[in-house]
A protein has these predicted regions:
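A cross-family structural signal marking well-folded subdomains
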Residues: 245-247, 276-465
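Basic- and aromatic-enriched surface patches that contact anionic nucleotides/nucleic acids
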Residues: 2-280, 284, 555, 561
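Long, cytosolic, alpha-helical-rich C-terminal regions that act as interaction/scaffolding modules
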Residues: 547, 557-587
Length: 587
């Protein structure tokens, strides 16, 4: 095994040189997360103020034992803030998340921000500081205030601090000027950290030598292949990369010259690992004339090592560096995202199509569209979302749609696809038809309301043929629609675009529920139905609706959870709030 905390490196390979790191002597095989964490302590504050997406490492100057976690033996606490949590985390070693009420109170008291306001925007990391800290100071600021003797220079620190903006500066200055500021202790700690030796295991040359089989193949890429095998073995330890991320890492090892293009094009669209997968599949699809399967490690290895595929390799590299951006811009226009159309997908749903329904996104990139009329784009977007949200065989739908659009890019081709793929979709109905079918008992029919059930009252029938017809016509749509939050996000697309304009769906860490800037708020509070022991005869009926999208709205995390028992009429007391929540006046 590899000792904890070590880096694993290897001598840089000439074939992997790229302009941004052509002087690098070694390449990192394992320890990327540790390297990124260490780098936080050296990020220049000026660069942080210019880039709101950076995380910040802080040191709390407070030494009061009463403010330390009960199980801590430290003199000082390190804290971190991230774009998803610009207010920081709880004061312990676990990655605890601060409660919405605490965040809301702090923003109101310190920044005069009302999270319930329609104009509220989440602060950036440089505008905030860890709110669960007393005197936080960026570690990079402390390091930049060290003098040539390796001592923390108090005057230089105060001078650097005076150039900073933020709500934390006043407390920091007061602490530094105060009598309890332990300059020597902090200096000693920083000096120890800066003088520490980071241990790295240099991969033995024998591990990187070509195997007998590779020597016989006369392949110039054998060095990279051996590193690939080593990297895969290392990936069995620590934080594992998923299959697609591992493939992307191997692609970067073989063809580092495409990395810059992929990083740039992926921003605000999708993760780099998905974009590279789609780009390779697109060229492979065009060369074969049939839909290429998702990439595998063996596919990449064959492509890299087969001397007969040199032309294909060059075609892929040229496409990514010269044409991929234009192709993605075309897809942006088709899905109504850039330029933004009233019917277009918000970025989060655009990214969802690419990540959860990649065959559908691949189909959009695989067709060489000319400039398309808006009505066609809108209809095609409708078909894509129909397939994504109500389709049960998206590979078949995408393949048939690709074939039909190759013959003619027209609305007729889209209609033909729906007809040919009717068995691949849940049947949809017009809103008025659905409203009539799901008609609920009236208030003067209390017994029917008490016993109402989705299946019993809508699908089941004493006539077996009638029940089968109800099930085939309606059940698939009802089951999908009730829980599909993508439909909810689309209904609230204007609000999502405006309120969360800085949300970047290409960052996988922001997909996690606790990192996403919105939460799903129960309009009728769940507190009235969840685990409630009551004699209310209508509770069963309410529970069946409480967790459907009809009772949800996407709402800012900081403002949600403040009204867990507040009735809908009170929290939706403005017309604009109703509109943003996609609720009509009569509802």
């Amino acid at each position: 095994g590899i000792p904890i905390g070590f880096f694993v490196i290897c001598k840089a390979i000439a074939e992997q040189r790229k302009t941004s790191d052509d002087k690098a002597q070694y390449q990192l095989l394992d320890g990327q997360q540790r390297a990124n964490a260490i780098a936080l302590g050296f990020n220049d504050w000026n660069s942080i103020e210019k880039d709101s997406k950076q995380s910040i490492l802080w040191l709390d100057l407070d030494t009061n034992p009463e403010n330390m976690p009960s199980d801590s033996s430290r003199n000082f606490l390190f804290r971190v803030t991230t774009p998803a949590h610009p207010w920081g985390y709880t004061k312990n070693d676990a990655e605890g998340y601060l409660g919405a009420a605490k965040i809301r109170t702090f923003l109101k008291d310190k920044l005069n921000l009302d999270t319930s306001s329609l104009k509220y925007k989440r602060p950036t990391t440089c505008e905030l500081a860890p709110i669960d800290a007393t005197c936080p100071v960026p570690v990079s600021l402390l390091i930049s205030s060290m003098n040539s003797n390796g001592e923390l220079d108090k005057n230089l620190l105060l001078d650097n601090l005076s150039k900073c903006k933020g709500i934390w500066t006043e407390n920091a200055e007061e602490a530094i000027r105060g009598s309890k500021f332990n300059l020597s202790l902090i200096s000693e700690g920083l000096r120890t950290a800066l003088n520490s030796t980071i241990l790295a295991i240099n991969t033995p040359a024998k591990l990187l030598e070509p195997s007998l089989q590779e020597n016989q193949s006369d392949n110039s890429r054998s060095n990279i292949t051996n590193i690939e095998h080593l990297f895969q073995r290392l990936n069995q330890q620590g934080t594992r990369l998923d299959g697609e991320e591992l493939i992307y890492s191997l692609i970067k090892a073989y063809w580092p010259e495409i990395t810059t293009s992929i990083d740039r094009i992926a921003q605000n669209r999708m993760a780099c690992s998905r974009l590279i997968n789609l780009a390779f599949r697109l060229i492979l699809t065009e060369n074969s004339g049939t839909f290429s399967a998702p990439l595998s490690i063996s596919t990449i290895r064959r492509l890299a090592k087969d001397t007969e595929k040199e032309q294909l390799r060059e075609e892929i590299i040229a496409f990514i560096n010269e044409k991929l951006d234009t192709v993605c811009q075309t897809v942006d226009a088709i899905l109504g995202m850039k330029p933004q159309s009233s019917w277009g997908l918000p970025p989060v749903l655009y990214s969802e199509i690419a990540h959860q329904h990649q065959d559908l996104y691949l189909m959009l990139t695989a067709k060489k569209y000319q400039e398309l009329p808006e009505d066609f784009c809108r209809t095609l977007t409708g078909l894509i979302t129909y397939a994504a949200w109500f389709g049960n065989d998206q590979r078949t739908i995408a393949s048939i749609l690709y074939k039909n659009l190759n013959q003619q890019a027209s609305i007729e081709a889209l209609q033909k696809t729906v007809k040919e793929c009717s068995h691949c979709f849940a049947r949809l109905h017009q809103p008025d038809e659905a409203a009539a079918f799901i008609a609920l008992p009236s208030s003067d029919q209390p017994d029917q309301i008490k016993s109402w059930n989705w299946w019993k009252d809508l699908i089941a029938d004493s006539d077996a043929a009638k029940q089968q017809e109800n099930e085939s016509q309606w059940w698939g749509m009802l089951c999908t629609m009730r829980q599909n939050k993508s439909l909810l996000l689309y209904a609230q697309r204007e609000f999502i675009r405006k309120r969360f304009s800085s949300y970047d769906p290409s960052r996988k860490d922001l997909w996690l529920e606790h990192n996403r800037p919105w939460d799903y708020d129960h309009i009728l509070p769940a507190a009235y139905t969840y685990n409630i022991k009551t004699n209310n005869e209508f509770a069963g009926f309410c529970k069946q609706w409480c967790n459907t999208i009809g009772n949800f709205r996407a709402w800012p995390y900081e403002d949600n959870r403040s009204d867990q028992a507040e009735m809908a009429g009170k929290k939706l007391n403005q017309t604009k709030l109703l509109e943003d929540s996609f609720i009509s006046d009569d509802e």
